[in-house]
């Protein structure tokens, strides 16, 4: 039985939008916590000749930042600040009752120095570092919508086409090849049908499903949460083993890839379904590995300095009762959990074999992982996660990931593969009509459309309408190209699903509101200069040049706008 481990790497555009607490420090922290440790782990496994067929998604907006000279400078400054903090922390600990934490302060200093050396080894270009591993055939890199726009709620088909097509083009520009796979932002999907997200708002009686845009953009597959497939209707493909296209009722198993069915039948696009059993073990602090008592406590931080010295400790313990962190013991637990995880995969494979690959019930019983019933050849366990879970939220997660691949190499029950290789070797023999939903809270769109965020959508929809109405004439006027291109960038940055998500969580609402309104205002001003009766094109050109220095992304966007405006695919 195949096993696909997929990671989704994303941050909104933060360069040139401040530093602390929510600006460039956001991406610099992610680089230290997750991206650099992950690259270090991949290199170590390569040296040890351990196969790591990871499927790694990097959103185009993140890839633009990771390849940026601005990021390189910001990261160097961040390293300097953090290393200075480590030195000051050691001095402050020495004269307090917390002197026993001094070895941990030195541990963090060594860790940061190692990461800085690695960063400089890559010349500060982390996108190129990930590209190296794909070119070596060790991982598969996949793409996403350009700025992680929440596709089901965008009002214009052209906007969806630009998000997907530009995302694909940017992936090709930065990583050197076309991606087969797509990470749908927030794993959000809607089928063909009526569209009216807000009662009384804009309505379209029959709108194309997301899979139609994905097909048009040239992608071969995406990932969905299990409830989108479980609630849909599955059927065998004509000519596949088992009969005709309507060959009887089929229980929708999460342990297979499906062709996504549209209104006219199966499309060329496939969907991998997230396994709820093994996934929960990895992401849940309450039920899974990250809540183990020996792992680093995320929430307790010592100020000044901002360093973490404590472990999770007893379940439910107060922050004041946390015990000192032991890195060696934590690494040992990561190995234990990796062995447990691979054993769990074996039990899932055994159950899938015993149920003929249906796997409709997700309870997995104990038992040896070494002698499962034969699972159907097309079976696959897919576990997609946010990359930032590993290292940032769960500090030991990167070590766990590396140990998982070591353990997988010691058994023969499940076979680790990239998503692309699974489909090449075992094409899907069933199709499914997916239902509307996402992998967010409640499994629907409510994290992005709710009373606290509803105000954002009419403003965004108005920008979409005026932009696409203005685009054809602006494309025909070279003097307007600079303004048109930057207006598109600002519109795309405003579309990032991050802003509604942050507002809904209540974490840093002011920052999300500021960024959303800022990009909307800039887009509105630039678009207004493209109107037939506009008299401020010169002022808009100056503003567009200023914004290009600030929001320096997607250098080839004008060609993508032209293709979309002409009704051509960007694949």
PLM regions: where:
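Short, solvent-exposed turn/loop segments enriched in Gly/Ser/Thr/Pro and often Arg
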Residues: 57-62, 145, 181-188, 227-228, ...
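Catalytic domains of cell-wall/extracellular-matrix polysaccharide-remodeling enzymes
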Residues: 165-168, 173-252, 376, 381-411, ...
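Compositionally biased, intrinsically disordered low-complexity segments enriched
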Residues: 354-373
């Amino acid at each position: 039985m195949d096993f696909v481990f997929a990671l989704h790497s994303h941050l909104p555009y933060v360069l040139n939008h401040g530093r602390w607490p929510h600006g460039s420090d956001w991406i610099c922290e992610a680089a230290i916590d997750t991206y650099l440790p992950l690259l270090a782990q991949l290199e170590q496994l390569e040296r040890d000749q351990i196969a790591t067929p990871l499927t790694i998604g990097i959103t185009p907006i993140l890839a633009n930042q990771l390849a940026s000279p601005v990021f390189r400078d910001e990261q160097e400054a961040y390293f300097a600040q953090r290393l200075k903090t480590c030195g000051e922390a050691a001095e402050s600990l020495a004269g307090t009752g917390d002197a026993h934490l001094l070895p941990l302060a030195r541990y963090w200093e060594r860790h940061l120095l190692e990461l800085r050396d690695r960063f400089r080894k890559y010349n500060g270009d982390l996108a190129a570092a990930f590209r190296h591993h794909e070119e070596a055939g060790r991982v598969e890199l996949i793409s996403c919508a350009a700025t992680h726009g929440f596709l089901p709620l965008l009002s214009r088909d052209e906007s969806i086409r630009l998000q997907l097509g530009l995302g694909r083009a940017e992936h090709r520009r930065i990583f050197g090849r076309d991606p087969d796979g797509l990470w749908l932002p927030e794993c959000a999907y809607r089928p063909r049908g009526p569209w009216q997200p807000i009662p009384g708002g804009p309505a379209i009686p029959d709108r194309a499903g997301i899979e139609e845009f994905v097909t048009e953009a040239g992608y071969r597959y995406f990932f969905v949460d299990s409830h989108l497939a479980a609630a849909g209707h599955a059927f065998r493909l004509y000519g596949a083993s088992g009969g005709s296209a309507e060959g009887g009722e089929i229980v929708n198993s999460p342990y297979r890839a499906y062709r996504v069915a549209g209104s006219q039948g199966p499309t060329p696009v496939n969907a991998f379904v997230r396994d709820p059993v093994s996934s929960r073990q990895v992401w849940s602090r309450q039920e899974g590995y990250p809540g183990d008592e020996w792992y680093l406590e995320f929430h307790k931080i010592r100020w000044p300095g901002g360093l973490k010295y404590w472990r999770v400790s007893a379940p439910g313990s107060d922050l004041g009762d946390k015990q000192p962190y032991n890195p060696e013991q934590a690494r040992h637990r990561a190995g234990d959990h990796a062995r447990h995880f691979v054993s769990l995969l074996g039990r899932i494979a055994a159950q899938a074999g015993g149920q003929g690959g249906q796997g409709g019930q997700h309870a997995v019983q104990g038992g040896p992982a070494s002698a499962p019933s034969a699972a159907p050849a097309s079976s696959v366990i897919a576990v997609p996660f946010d990359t930032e879970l590993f290292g940032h939220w769960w500090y030991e997660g990167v070590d766990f990931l590396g140990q998982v691949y070591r353990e997988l190499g010691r058994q023969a029950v499940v076979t680790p593969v990239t998503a692309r290789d699974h489909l090449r070797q075992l094409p899907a023999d069933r199709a499914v009509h997916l239902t509307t939903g996402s992998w967010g809270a409640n499994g629907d769109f409510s994290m992005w459309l709710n009373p606290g965020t509803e105000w954002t959508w009419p403003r965004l929809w108005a920008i979409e309408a005026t932009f696409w109405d203005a685009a054809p004439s602006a494309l025909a006027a070279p003097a307007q190209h600079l303004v048109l291109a930057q207006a598109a960038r600002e519109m795309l940055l405003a579309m990032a699903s991050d802003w509604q998500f942050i507002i809904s969580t209540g974490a840093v609402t002011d920052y999300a509101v500021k960024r959303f309104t800022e990009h909307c205002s800039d887009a509105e001003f630039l678009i207004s200069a493209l109107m037939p009766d506009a008299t401020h094109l010169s002022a808009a050109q100056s503003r567009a040049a200023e914004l290009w220095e600030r929001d320096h992304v997607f250098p080839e966007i004008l060609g993508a706008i032209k293709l979309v405006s002409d009704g051509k695919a960007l694949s």
